[in-house]
């Protein structure tokens, strides 16, 4: 029987109940992580939970969990649910309290829930590429926190779906930031460009992996801003995330990226990613 982790216990889905006064439900007052499982093993799990605890710290949320404890509960959940290929979703909120914008006084216990999902890798997208659209970035100014507040992302993703695209690449003014659920990259003249780490983007774990792969393959990797026009005139465009891995974007706003085919640097990064899965899954 499927198990869900809820506030220190492994329970059945029917037992996994939270209060209508949970601050995650009322205010989106919480954080989350999404961790890939390959061959029954957790991929880059330490990096994910280090970011999880950083996000908690940034919003003043004391979880009383170490990275090691979070990894252990994740392993148990994967084993209990017999997940071979899939993911773990974990979120923490500020807990249950009467509705008030300020933090609860006295403090209440944070609420933590984690569950697993079985699903295959996006082989078709990886091999053939996807369509993308560009859209104005309307999100808040702390995108470096992996917050439950995802309405801006949801609206951007729905815009992509409306125009038969898989991802919406966002921009503030003319400056490209990131995808609605991914980091974005423009490849030009053999150089990978992506937005620098700051409050406008999430420092994606797959982004970190791609940077390391680029170093291994001696591909220049520049963390600097670029424009929508630069993106549309790139030789290759990719988006990356825990679920998307290294996905090529072959069409933007209805127009082909370069010749509309998956490029050679994208293929190198995908090759390196396969090796990284083997060496960084525990």
Curated annotation (Swiss-Prot):
Principal EC category: transferase
The record ties this protein, via Pfam families, to: Aminotran_4
Q: Name one GO molecular function term.
A: D-alanine-2-oxoglutarate aminotransferase activity
This enzyme catalyses:
D-alanine + 2-oxoglutarate = D-glutamate + pyruvate
Q: Which residues of this UniProt protein bind substrate?
A: 32, 99, 101
GO biological-process terms attached to the record = carboxylic acid biosynthetic process; D-amino acid metabolic process
Q: Supply one GO CC term from the record.
A: cytosol
Record-annotated residues binding pyridoxal 5'-phosphate? Answer: 51, 178
Q: Which keywords are on file for this protein?
A: Aminotransferase, Pyridoxal phosphate, Transferase
Which InterPro entries does this chain map to?
Answer: Aminotrans_IV (IPR001544), Aminotrans_IV_CS (IPR018300), Aminotransferase-like (IPR036038), BCAT-like_C (IPR043132), BCAT-like_N (IPR043131), Class-IV_PLP-Dep_Aminotrnsfr (IPR050571), D_amino_transT (IPR005784)
Q: Which cofactor does it need?
A: pyridoxal 5'-phosphate
What EC number is given for this enzyme? 2.6.1.21
Q: Where is the active site?
A: 146 (proton acceptor)
On this chain, the residues bearing N6-(pyridoxal phosphate)lysine are: 146
Q: Which family does it belong to?
A: Belongs to the class-IV pyridoxal-phosphate-dependent aminotransferase family.
Question: What role does it play?
Answer: Acts on the D-isomers of alanine, leucine, aspartate, glutamate, aminobutyrate, norvaline and asparagine. The enzyme transfers an amino group from a substrate D-amino acid to the pyridoxal phosphate cofactor to form pyridoxamine and an alpha-keto acid in the first half-reaction. The second half-reaction is the reverse of the first, transferring the amino group from the pyridoxamine to a second alpha-keto acid to form the product D-amino acid via a ping-pong mechanism. This is an important process in the formation of D-alanine and D-glutamate, which are essential bacterial cell wall components.
| Assembly notes | Homodimer.
Q: What is this protein called?
A: D-alanine aminotransferase
The organism encoding this protein is: Staphylococcus aureus (strain COL)
